[in-house]
Amino acid sequence: MKDGIIQPWLNYDSMLVYSMNFLKRCELLDTPDGPKPAYLVTSKFNEDGTYPEGRNRNNQGGNAYFGMKLFRYYYPYFGDIDALRPVRDLLDRMAYFLTPDDWAWPGMVRTQDNDNPDGIYLDERIETDKAAMAAIAYFDYAEFTGEQKYKALAEHISSLLLACTGEGDAENSPLPFRINMRTGEVEEYYSSDMIFVVELYDKLLGMDTSLDKADIKAKRDLVLKWIKDYPMRNSLWSGYFEDVELALNNVNQFAPMETARYFLNNPSANPELEQDVLDLLAFVKGRFGGTVRFGGTSICEQDVCFIEMSSHTARYASVLARWAALTGNQAAKDEALATFALAEYSAYNKYSKGDVAINSTGLGYPKCWFSDSYFDYLPHYFEGMAAWPEMIPEGSDHIFSTTCMLKDVAYAPGNVKYSAMEPEGTERIKLSFTPKVLSGGKELPKSMWSFGKWRDCEGILTINRKGIKDIEIIKK
């Protein structure tokens, strides 16, 4: 506590590493085709790290999306390539259980394991927002690894989603929420969580693809317009969580916050960016954030599960931190930093040992979920650090912000190396030493980099690459 404001109880680097260690060393559970990491088999486990006899319905599609997002932050920040393994496990497991060729949706991944959770994915139902999230994860994984089979699967998923994208209205989203993949029958018509469809179509428009880009652009614009015309106006932010059935009026915080994040990432998509994000933040805080603890706002999940959870608290903090950086609003920054600190108090619970963190779901929710405790929890801290690097521990060296994927990241005392996957881009690195910046053994022109204070934090190196990919930073 400092001046009545909550502070992190564990430095964020340690929390992130210990949490990733839990995923990398995840216990194997028996399935009908052999032992598999628990995150492929169930979504939930006990606060002491044990697994109940009955498996909980799984949400592998969403976990794959957030797992890949986590890797995109974690790898540049720590240089740990092993953090990719849980993502590969999730993507390969989904790809192993594609739907039969004679189904209405052939060759489709199963993004949930609800019918008989056991690690064997045989569900007939798809949720279209999760399909979009899975496709994004496959595209990003293919980009990083160069393995084109993952891109081909992502394009196939995208083609099926494009085929069912149409006009929406107040009771029908542009893509139905839930569809029976065997029959093609629509089971639920409405989900406000359409922003991942927009993100997927954006990705397709920015790459080489065999799909019709005119069709993609038209449908991308249609979905984005629907979001602005309906949930942005009527606040009917329902339809995301896999374990909630037929609940049109069950509002959640997830969809408005992820929509706000999209607007922050894509300012050209919304001329009213500052006000719209502020309105979404105010809506979520007003409906789900009634509890304030020592300056930090604690966020509940949804109307039918009105419980404070750290993943959603950290999600709110990450969007608020980004908005504060955009606008220069000091009060918003202070609230965001306190909210991040509050959300950390469920990490590394009393059953954790050594360098492995068992993370409870929230302060009053001791059980653990792979989504809420790990995959959809940890990435929000990296977004906070990208906005406000003072969250990064002093005396450490970290690449905390990039505009493209990086490879061959390596850290040594007084030395940082990496290769960017695109010839132009910007990286920001917090350093414990005064740097000299090289590319190909030659000093980088001073016009391409600067070192000093950035957003209230000293020791920040900003590199604006033009026509180069390989960077080495050495102590001056």
Model-assigned labels for residue ranges:
Residues 1-33, 89, 203, 207, ...:
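Terminal, non-catalytic domain-edge segments
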Residues 77, 97, 144, 164, ...:
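Alpha-solenoid helical repeat scaffolds
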